[in-house]
């Protein structure tokens, strides 16, 4: 729970490492997150009455709406899911129902809890995995196996995963084999055998049937688990490096140690208390955006979303989940509509409104250079793998920023995503030729940027198709 104990200023500081500007939005999400921590410090009867203040982010595409929510979830290691409001259909029509967003959130929570539980038992699982691996690398002497002689009971026992126990009983281990196994175990623990190939037997991954499962999952029934319990676990052989084999076996042994029921109950609790659901393109399901359209009205989708945002119980295959304390963050450009076009009940469930600013040329300069793993740092690192060093001059970066701003202004405004298309166009030849170039240093100057991009920028029709 320590990750929740961050002050709003600390949260904003961490968001600043990845997102340029948008201080009002960062401040609002930081306060919403801190309020969760504050609620958990209160008495239990008061906790139940304090619900999250959901946010509505308003701003054009590419200004950081999704990234703010995604980074926020990573900062506190909270279950997070992003959905598009336009993907849902109201009850009675073919398509995804709105409750699927909650089920997706639980799946994400399962992954988080599973990772935490597996790391807790890692040392124990590694020890068991190494023991299995040593037996594969230094096999025992096989005894002569007695024929089953048509004994149906023995054959049935073999089907139900008894073959492993029989194999161990039919192996003879001499003193030399024990000595070799001790030696191999020492080498294994030191990582000296990591690149050696080995053939291991592991359980076959579960096959899922999503198309059949959706309806049953709404009733809290997991068809895959039901069918899996009826059929025996199959083993498959895989030839991998010792390092990869170790990872596969550790995962398998961890699953045996950890109790699935504990993972499921903890994941439900985590999703209920810390889950974040980001609903994108909520402006596309307003009545205003549906005018003169032949599509089914999306107002029904708004009414289906309403009880989930208000707080209701959703059945998942891991158990029922209450949505009362899940934080919902909705976003939309609202070019053709406005927030007041949402149904009044839904408007009231998003009391905090944050308008994100359009990006300026100065913002683009910052985006290219300041964040952790900024775009220019990414391209320099990629080309650096070919032993070619690339340096961007300050003037070149400023010119790139102004080009991105001008193209956004004169064509469609896609925000920071414009920088991706411009950099790809600028570095296209270099990315193609780099493997055949000798080691050296290349400086990207303002003149080089103009040479590569000016003709396209000046021709508005070309800009629309290429940039």
Curated annotation (Swiss-Prot):
It is found in: Cytoplasm. GO terms for molecular function: ATP binding; ATP hydrolysis activity; peptidase activity; proteasome-activating activity. SUPFAM superfamilies: P-loop containing nucleoside triphosphate hydrolases (SSF52540). GO terms for cellular component: HslUV protease complex. ATPase subunit of a proteasome-like degradation complex; this subunit has chaperone activity. The binding of ATP and its subsequent hydrolysis by HslU are essential for unfolding of protein substrates subsequently hydrolyzed by HslV. HslU recognizes the N-terminal part of its protein substrates and unfolds these before they are guided to HslV for hydrolysis. Pfam families: AAA, AAA_2. Belongs to the ClpX chaperone family. HslU subfamily. InterPro entries: AAA+_ATPase, ATP-dep_Clp_protease_ClpX, ATPase_AAA_core, Clp_ATPase_C, HslU, P-loop_NTPase. Its main location: cytoplasm. Keywords: ATP-binding, Chaperone, Cytoplasm, Nucleotide-binding. CDD domains: RecA-like_HslU. The gene is hslU. This is ATP-dependent protease ATPase subunit HslU. ATP binds at residues 20, 62-67, 280, 345, 417. PANTHER family: ATP-DEPENDENT CLP PROTEASE ATP-BINDING SUBUNIT CLPX-LIKE, MITOCHONDRIAL-RELATED, ATP-DEPENDENT PROTEASE ATPASE SUBUNIT HSLU. It comes from the Bacteria. A double ring-shaped homohexamer of HslV is capped on each side by a ring-shaped HslU homohexamer. The assembly of the HslU/HslV complex is dependent on binding of ATP. GO terms for biological process: protein unfolding; proteolysis involved in protein catabolic process.
């Amino acid at each position: 729970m320590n990750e929740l104990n961050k002050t709003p200023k600390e949260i904003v500081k961490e968001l600043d490492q990845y997102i340029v500007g948008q201080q009002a939005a960062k401040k609002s999400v930081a306060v919403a997150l801190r309020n969760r921590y504050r609620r958990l410090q209160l008495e239990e009867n008061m906790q139940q009455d304090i619900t999250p203040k959901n946010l509505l982010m308003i701003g054009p595409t590419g200004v950081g709406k999704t990234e703010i929510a995604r980074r926020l979830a990573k900062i506190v290691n909270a279950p997070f899911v992003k959905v598009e409001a336009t993907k849902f259909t109201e009850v009675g029509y073919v398509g995804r129902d709105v409750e699927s967003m909650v089920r997706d959130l639980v799946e994400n929570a399962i992954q988080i809890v599973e990772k935490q539980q597996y790391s807790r038992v890692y040392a124990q699982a590694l020890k068991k995995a190494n023991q299995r691996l040593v037996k594969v690398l230094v096999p025992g002497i096989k005894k002569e196996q007695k024929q089953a002689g048509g004994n149906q009971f023995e054959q049935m026992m073999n089907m139900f995963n008894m073959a492993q126990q029989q194999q161990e009983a039919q192996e003879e281990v001499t003193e030399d084999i024990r000595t070799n196994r001790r030696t191999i175990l020492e080498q294994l623990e030191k990582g000296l055998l990591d690149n050696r190939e080995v053939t291991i037997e592991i359980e076959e991954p579960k096959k899922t049937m999503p198309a059949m499962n959706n309806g049953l999952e709404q009733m809290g029934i997991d068809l895959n688990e039901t069918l899996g319990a009826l059929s025996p676990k199959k083993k498959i052989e895989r030839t991998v490096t010792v390092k990869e084999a170790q990872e596969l076996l550790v995962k398998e042994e961890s699953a045996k140690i950890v109790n699935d029921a504990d993972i499921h109950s903890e994941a439900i609790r985590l999703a209920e208390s810390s889950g974040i659901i980001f609903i994108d393109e909520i402006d596309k399901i307003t009545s205003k955006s549906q005018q003169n359209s032949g599509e089914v009205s999306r107002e029904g989708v708004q009414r289906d979303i309403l009880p989930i945002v208000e707080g209701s119980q959703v059945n998942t295959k891991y158990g029922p989940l209450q949505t009362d304390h899940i934080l919902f963050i909705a976003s939309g450009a609202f070019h053709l509509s406005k927030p007041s076009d949402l149904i009044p009940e839904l408007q009231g469930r998003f009391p905090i409104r944050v308008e994100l600013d359009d990006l300026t040329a100065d913002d683009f300069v910052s985006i290219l250079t300041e964040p952790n793993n900024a775009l220019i740092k990414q391209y320099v690192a990629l080309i650096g793998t070919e032993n070619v060093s690339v340096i961007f001059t300050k003037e070149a970066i400023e010119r790139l920023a102004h080009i991105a701003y001008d193209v956004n202004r004169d064509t469609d405004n896609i925000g920071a995503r414009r920088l991706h298309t411009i950099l790809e166009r600028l570095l296209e030849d270099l990315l193609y030729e780099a493997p055949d170039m000798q080691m050296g240093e290349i400086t990207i100057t303002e003149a080089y940027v103009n040479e590569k991009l000016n003709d396209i920028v000046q021709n508005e029709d070309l800009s629309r198709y290429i940039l």
